[in-house]
Regions:
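Juxtamembrane extracytoplasmic segments of single-/few-pass membrane proteins
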Residues: 1-73, 77-80
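Ordered hydrophobic segments in well-structured contexts
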Residues: 59-60, 71-75, 84-87, 109-111, ...
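A short, solvent-exposed beta-edge/loop patch
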Residues: 78, 96-142
Length: 142
């Protein structure tokens, strides 16, 4: 008999990483010149509001099919390249590891009030400043 992998063995990091690789050809070099208003129209569903985006260049924002339901998918221009952000509802049954990497990309997961925030960027990208910038500007209504 084949060993069955249970769904609970999947990690949030693995799903997010696969999503970044899967979408990369579609959003590479795309700049939708995203406004704060557009971001907040999408974030509202997750109970979050971004209070400002000074110093942040957001090139893409949308809902995406993430594991068992929707998540927010946003791409921010980092120092070394694009940094992908996912806001994933907390009820999504995936194991959480605070950091993960595969040699090309690395990621961090921050459990926030209303959702888990996943950030993924280049191995050389410093994700902590991006995380702090976002976390300090996110306001939760839930």
């Amino acid at each position: 008999s084949w060993p069955l992998t249970t769904q609970s063995e999947l990690s949030l990091g693995q799903v997010a990483m696969a999503h970044v690789y899967g979408e990369e050809p579609f959003i590479k070099d795309v700049d939708e010149k995203v406004s704060l208003r557009t971001i907040n129209a999408k974030m509202e569903k997750y109970g979050a509001t971004l209070m400002g985006m000074d110093g942040m260049k957001v090139t893409y924002v949308n809902h995406c099919a993430f594991y068992q339901g929707p998540a927010l998918h946003m791409v921010i221009q980092g120092k070394m390249g694009p940094v992908t952000l996912f806001l994933v509802p907390k009820h999504v049954p995936l194991t959480i590891q605070p950091d993960f990497a595969d040699g090309t990309l690395k990621g961090e997961i921050l459990p926030l009030k209303g959702a888990n925030m996943v950030l993924i960027g280049d191995m050389q990208e410093s994700l902590a400043p991006v995380a702090q910038q976002l976390e300090s500007r996110l306001h939760w209504s839930i």
